[in-house]
Amino acid sequence: MKRILIVEDEPDIQELLRTYLEDAGYGTAVAEDGVAALSLFHAQPFDLILLDLMLPKIDGFGVCEMIRQQSQVPIIMLTALDGED
């Protein structure tokens, strides 16, 4: 079974992604911040990472940079930002 790491701090989005992916036959793990994401990443292999940009502790860019130093696992960056700053 392919495993996907969901890194998202919003509980509703976590649940939506987890439910959709598990219903499609994927195994999932959920991290609510950048530190938890790195801990899970080091603890078990994943086939894909869905990574929110805006996270507590370490943002998505920082997490991506640290993972890229060790792995070429595919990463899809997500954001709920909808306006211009």
Residue positions per predicted region:
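N-terminal/domain-start alpha-helical segments
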Residues: 1-85
